[in-house]
């Protein structure tokens, strides 16, 4: 049966009319309504006069064969003696040394000089003293020692002098020298004078000073013994040295003395030149500087702030002009395809015109919708990258190089592993860049690293951000940018970095086009004042060059992401900063000294917790300096699930690993360090027995440690090194003390640990500020094992069979041979402990007494 509902014609007729009217309205909207976005009225870009070089000659004046200073057997390291570790000028010196990747040791001036030599060579190739007055008034013994070192090892000295405002004396003879100085001087001209020091500076260049500039310069009188490097001319017309080179003809010590601090850009360039004269060589020094300018988010921006067609035309023409300053210069354009044609009519046309001229630029991908990597997993990241790649293919964008940039550098550092995986899979990325490694500030300390096959280069800012579009609205005035260009931070960014990758945004190329002004004037100023050769090369070539120059940076240096607010903001959810997940204490060995027993006993304390056992590495984490380090911070944190008062790990491989101190200090700088001191002869013998039990083929073939010590074969030398290395205490301690203070360390006597473990544990727990705990109740000697074990629930729990292994006593002739090998090391350890008023183990007392 069919049921037909009752229809009232009075109801259906009006409904039909309403539907018809709606249909007609929709047709009208489609045909006649103007659906375009009205463009925001654009003013013409403000014209600002470009920098003009005051010299007709702009070609370089550097010598083809530069002279470099040579030392007599010294390490490539600098000793910096500062007025204070917190002085502003001292920090500037340190930042320059960091930027040049130079190894240095910085100390505040004190009564005692640091040790200047090892048993075989000098520790430093250059001495920098921030305050020359402090050097002149140094205790006679210290100054004689310093001068003797500089003379014997041909080590130059740099130092700075400043005027004393209230001193009435103008002309003063420098103490112990024939050099005369003038203080509180006002100069009219500062000029670069001929000298073997200059590399970057253009000889003959000068700049004028006004009569209102302060009279606070120090000038030096020159002679055959003292050469001017940078000169200042006073009102009377006399030309004297602002920077003087003492040739060492009086006392055998070469010095470069600066009469001005590094706030003046010409003085700063001279300091940089002097550094390369003292520390460089023909192979390491170059005047080439590679510059890459990235335009990030070329389609991203609020309506009314984006580039239009005229801006694109100007971008193309300016790129050609820039090639007069920078060889092969090409802009790099980063894209998030979802935002294409997302502006008003003029801006949409700008996007279209940019794509029409895509072949004129180099393109690289961001994310499809400017996504933040740390918020997404691998599957999602892969999908949005694939969308962006499809967009690039459809628009015929030439993505010619395996280079990508993550929006806001999110996921690069701290590393988001899933971003790296997705990059490799979708784009086959092998190069990226970030401003966040190891930290955003200071910029001079930024570095590169390689992770998961991707080369990460340091990235630089230029003072331009998405909101900086107009000269008149620049925060703090556009004078700030001009100062940065003309001898300021931006200028020195290029001078200090062999490769500079600058981050800009498309908004910086709209309206007043601040980016074009900034870089044109930067290039002009560099060409005017320096011999630097500016070049562009693709990012893949740059990455290869960077890590060829700085191979030590290949392995990343992990930091605690929870202590840097910028890093904390871009952490993946898997890292929880509210939970303590890094150790407070490291038991670093060395191996075969009882470190496993110490860790086992310390874990008895209810307020301590040890890392979870790690398979394949004798339950040790073996993170710092080992293969596990490449697994990253998140993996390391995952080994410390507890949040006890004191969390610790024991990895006996750390002590003599050359990379461990620096890596540990970077991640856990406030950790306390436990070092166990055992007679190195006994330790070497124990280690040999250990590898013999583990069937090391070289040890088995040799049969005894004595044979290993006498053999000259390569394989035997490696085993010998493994046996001997851990017992060279002061040699390795020196490296740990470069990164940790002595107050962070405690030394445990291995013999005392073996005989009286509760005493050692009580002392250790007190040092760690732990509540008292009756260790003697939970530690018992096991006659069958021959060592102490833990007592839990009335039962002894001893270490495994590999611990406390019984083996024949060491032959007396072998002991004598090992004692001789370690005699100098033992003597150094004795002096170190005595100097620092630390307890000296009985075995060490006897060793030194027998040797005496």
Curated annotation (Swiss-Prot):
EC number(s) per entry: 2.8.2.8, 3.-.-.-, 2.8.2.-
Protein's UniProt keywords contain Nucleotidyltransferase: no
Tissue-specific expression: Present in some specific neurons in head and tail regions and muscles.
Pathway: Glycan metabolism; heparan sulfate biosynthesis; Glycan metabolism; heparin biosynthesis
Record topology, Lumenal segments: 35-852
Topology term for the membrane: Single-pass type II membrane protein
Coiled coil start-end: none
Pfam hit, one: HSNSD_N
Signal peptide (from-to): none
Active site: 592
Residue spans, topological domain Cytoplasmic: 1-13
A single Gene Ontology CC term: Golgi apparatus
Positions that bind 3'-phosphoadenylyl sulfate: 592-596, 686, 803-807
Alphabetical keyword list: Disulfide bond, Glycoprotein, Golgi apparatus, Hydrolase, Membrane, Multifunctional enzyme, Signal-anchor, Transferase, Transmembrane, Transmembrane helix
TM ranges: 14-34
List of glycosylated residues: 50, 72, 261, 328, 377, 428, 576, 607, 712
Keyword Disulfide bond annotated: yes
GO molecular function: deacetylase activity; heparan sulfate N-sulfotransferase activity; hydrolase activity
Region (Heparan sulfate N-deacetylase 1): 34-574
UniProt record, GO biological process: heparan sulfate proteoglycan biosynthetic process; heparin proteoglycan biosynthetic process
Region (Heparan sulfate N-sulfotransferase 1): 575-852
Family label: Belongs to the sulfotransferase 1 family. NDST subfamily.
Known role: Essential bifunctional enzyme that catalyzes both the N-deacetylation and the N-sulfation of glucosamine (GlcNAc) of the glycosaminoglycan in heparan sulfate. Modifies the GlcNAc-GlcA disaccharide repeating sugar backbone to make N-sulfated heparosan, a prerequisite substrate for later modifications in heparin biosynthesis.
Protein name (database record): Bifunctional heparan sulfate N-deacetylase/N-sulfotransferase 1
Organism: Caenorhabditis elegans
Lineage: Eukaryota, Metazoa, Ecdysozoa, Nematoda, Chromadorea
